[in-house]
Amino acid sequence: MNFSIDSNMLRLALILIIAAFAATANAQEDDLLALLGEEEVTDFTYATFKVNRIINLHSVENTARGVLDIKISHRFGFLNSGISDLFGLDQASIRIGADYGITERLMVGVGRSSYEKTYDGFLKYKILRQSSGAKTMPVTASFLATTAIKTIPFQNPDRENYFSSRMYYTFQVLIGRKFSESISVQLSPTVVHRNLVRTSSEANDVYSLGAGGRLKLTKRTSLNLEYVYVLPNQLAPGYRNSFSVGFDIETGGHVFQLHFTNSTSMIEKGYIAETVGNWLNGDVHFGFNVSRVFTVN
């Protein structure tokens, strides 16, 4: 699913959104506390999102310090593959990962995907925390750096191939705000660097803007939406922007994320720069993420 957006309009929209975050976050002094002469405290915002992924995109949430988060992500084939493939259920790709919270602000993670036999790792650091009271901060912000290594054989083994050609890097700033107990929104400006591209018409550095949102439906369920807009003239014809919709279901120590997406890959270099599915043609995957946390320290 692609939408045509003028770059200047995009910049203006970003400025307006950030300004809206700041405007809605101005804290009012508590008259009662002032009368009593009590010191005002800082109240930090928690659970902007339920887990550290919206669907594909990382969220501003971190795995807590000393907690190990085991994730299993499953992506079936396209729904339009027909009854012979049981609408995609006969095809599947999987990613198994482990995230760990080193501190309350710093987390790391590793994973392996069956799609293109890719290994990935990341580091995420929380820069700002949304808060009100004595110290006011309108948003939560994090920095994410990832790397991925594709291990499938080179398509042309007769030429000189380099190990560095298998490498991909992603740098992302996550800016999120919890507007109420029910509504959270996040923006994710991103650059994906690819050491090797297939054609000269493709850019090694791919710039994009991800946007995600969460609508809490009940105490344990929520509706999530996610869209990644890739700026024009960076990818070869046929690639599309990633769009996903899903539901989070919390059951004790597990969180199930059920979703539909036109992206096959479950890591940044793939769903941002390599999505080919067209929602209008039924090129949509059903998939799920399962998260189970363990306190190890």
Protein language model features and the residues they cover:
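Charged helix-capping and loop-helix junction motifs
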Residues: 203-208, 239-243
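Surface-exposed extracellular loop regions of Gram-negative outer-membrane beta-barrel proteins
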Residues: 92-94, 209, 214-224
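Extended, charged alpha-helical interaction scaffolds
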Residues: 196-197, 201
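Transmembrane beta-barrel domains of Gram-negative outer membranes and organellar outer membranes
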Residues: 28-159, 167-171, 176-187, 191-195, ...
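Sec-dependent signal peptide hydrophobic core
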Residues: 10-17
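N-terminal signal peptide c-region/cleavage motif recognized by signal peptidases
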Residues: 22-24
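N-terminal secretory signal peptides that target proteins for export/translocation
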Residues: 1-9
